[in-house]
Amino acid sequence: MSEVEHQELDLNGEMLARREKLAKLREQGNPFPNTFRRDAYAEKLHAQYDEVEGEALKEQDIQVKVAGRIMLKRVMGKASFFTIQDVSGQIQLYVARDNLAEGVYADKVSMWDLGDIVGAAGTLFKTKTGELTVRCSEVELLTKSLRPLPNKVQGLTDQETRYRQRYLDLISNEESRRTFMIRSKMVSGIRQFFLEKDFIEVETPMLQVIPGGAAAKPFITHHNALDVDMYLRIAPELYLKRLVVGGFERVFELNRNFRNEGVSVRHNPEFTMIEYYQAYADYHDLMDNTEELLRKLAIDILGTTTVPYGEYVFDFGKPFERITMHDAIVKYGNGITREDLDSFEKSVEIAKGLGIEIQKSWGLGSVVNAIFEEVAEHQLIQPTFLMAHPAEISPLARRNDENPEVTDRFELFIGGREIGNGFSELNDAEDQAERFDAQVAAKDAGDDEAMFKDEDFVVALEHGLPPTAGEGLGIDRLAMIFANAPSIRDVILFPAMRQK
């Protein structure tokens, strides 16, 4: 018999034994009671009483009601120790036959297994080893677990199982619970940051007739009642800018986007972003905003502006570097000159030498961008704003007044990865229409990620968009940094997985 077959046999036997216990418990009443009114959490109890001496604790006679999942169990005849886990941490229970009502220990507590959820009321005390413990006078089974937990020594270590059965991961791994608590705190902090700056939070369509706001492949669906193909949004940008046209001068949306592309340690087809727009501001203002936001998040979440991530330590306390795309290539490109990047023929030659496959629809701007991604992107380790992107690859960004071939745009890179993208918005309706036409031509030439033309958005611009800047920040990638997580799947509760 194989190891897998042995494990399946053991599992089946364990589940059968638990179901038999459940049947006996049903004879005594409902083993799934509706409520238990607890008044204490493990973390707060430890914070308040871990340093209190045993005698002093006994004199205080502190009564508590706790609840949680059984993670450890030690049976010693007429008494047992259980370690239960709630959302905040773990606390030990001392359950003795003589401290409970008659028959409770033999008929009920004896049926408890690892993974069961229980409630207990009693008095705090310290064991001989000094561990804070609840001496239970009342106990109640709240939920019977029919499946055993992962091995209590090894925990849940299989990565794929952790992603597919996130509930087991959260039960078994404190680090995973910490990761998602960090993410939650980060999201709350971001929302509060913008609300305090007088932004209003809005919601824009997830289903769109024309997907826009980014260069990406959309998911396609069909609306039966309207008999029209629709797309899951790739970005909320064009709708948010319509709102600025309408007079909402500071707006943000913190929500999901969808892109029908590859899955990797940095990419999930369903992901979270905050996108915000500020009238009467430019891209320099947004870079300042971003520095302020990340510095505040680091302090609020980690208590410091130095953020460890893998082999790196990011410094959010000092001003972020600001460098143009062309200067970054010259800096890291091993002899590539600015003059090289001004020549289409020379840039193509350099790109081919780097193994880059040139697309038919590419102009000079796309070639230069591909060279940057190959030679410089991975070098931007400390927080860096990359600026002055070619207009060709920035169809929604405002052209730079001094050099119309590039735009007033920035991307935020941390650890060699893009975290955010922002720019002074293009508010010239005629220029926008021309750039949409160029995107349509690129799509016709085979570029699946080129943008659709949104005529209604052009009409909105014709009514007048004030000088505006906007930015999108990837929530998942930011969470990776603050939680020191190597994969985007580690910070998404239920990441996309191939079906078994």
UniProtKB/Swiss-Prot annotation:
What is the name listed in the Swiss-Prot or TrEMBL entry for this protein? Lysine--tRNA ligase
Q: How is the cofactor bound?
A: Binds 3 Mg(2+) ions per subunit.
Binding of Mg(2+) 2, residues:
418
Q: Name one GO biological process term.
A: lysyl-tRNA aminoacylation
- Which prosthetic group or cofactor does it need? Mg(2+)
Q: Which organism is it from?
A: Actinobacillus pleuropneumoniae serotype 7 (strain AP76)
Per UniProt, what is one Pfam family of this protein? tRNA-synt_2
Taken from the UniProt record, the cysteine pairs bridged by disulfide bonds within this chain are none
Q: Molecular function terms in GO for this entry?
A: ATP binding; lysine-tRNA ligase activity; magnesium ion binding; tRNA binding
Name the keywords, alphabetized: Aminoacyl-tRNA synthetase, ATP-binding, Cytoplasm, Ligase, Magnesium, Metal-binding, Nucleotide-binding, Protein biosynthesis
Sites where the protein binds Mg(2+) 1: 411, 418
Q: How does it assemble?
A: Homodimer.
Q: Which reactions appear under catalytic activity for this entry? A: tRNA(Lys) + L-lysine + ATP = L-lysyl-tRNA(Lys) + AMP + diphosphate
